[in-house]
A protein has these predicted regions:
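Active-site/ligand-binding-proximal alpha/beta "capping" segment
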Residues: 163-171
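Glycine-rich phosphate/ribose-binding loops and adjacent secondary-structure elements
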Residues: 144, 159-162
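Short, Lys/Arg-enriched N-terminal segments with co-localized hydrophobic residues
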Residues: 1-7
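Glycine-rich beta-alpha loop segments
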Residues: 9-143, 148-150
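Short, hinge-like loop/turn segments at secondary-structure boundaries
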Residues: 135-137, 155-160
């Protein structure tokens, strides 16, 4: 049955008695929790997911998604006030192609102008833009694929390289 104007609730309004008390106690015990109102909502969402969904794959996806998003915030957080440009391009572009040189020069000019460069962290155009910007001005947001790219040498080992399991988190 489909309800036409169904709206997803983004805030939990129903009280949960002892569960609310336990969550509040957990937040107090954890100490140093920033924005406890949001942490409380995330804990409630996790508990509700565990109650409502018994599908292992769904729960694994939610768990991994939250972990990837948390790590992304940790990596990008120190650069919150630094402007960034995302460069998209083929991993199959060869260094001897003119467009490779253009991407490299573009990355260099962005870094000189105070921008950081975000790429998919792969080869080709992505590597060229990272090379131009240099490792200190580069982010790589890679994806784990069974047959595809590894991180390019510019971002490999860089603390600003994030390797995702899910494409939707990478975007």
């Amino acid at each position: 049955y489909y309800k036409e104007n169904r709206v997803m609730q983004l805030h939990f309004t129903k009280t949960n008695g002892p569960v609310d008390e336990a969550i509040n106690q957990l937040i107090r015990i954890a100490d140093g929790i920033h924005r406890p109102e949001y942490v409380r909502e995330m804990i409630l969402a996790a508990l509700k997911a565990g109650q409502e969904d018994d599908d292992r794959a769904d729960l694994k996806l939610m768990n991994t998604t939250l972990k990837e998003m948390r790590f992304t915030a940790k990596v990008f957080g120190p650069y919150r006030n630094v402007r960034k440009v995302t460069v998209f391009g083929s991993a199959r572009t060869s260094p001897d192609e003119p467009v490779y040189d253009m991407a490299q020069e573009f990355g260099r000019k962005l870094a000189e102008a105070g921008y950081m460069v975000i790429t998919g962290g792969g080869n080709g155009i992505m590597e060229a833009a990272n090379e131009g910007a240099g490792p200190e001005h580069s982010f790589g947001v890679n994806i784990r694929l069974p047959f595809e790219q590894r991180a390019n040498p510019v971002v490999e080992g860089n603390p600003r390289l994030i390797t995702y399991k899910y494409f939707f988190n990478r975007k």
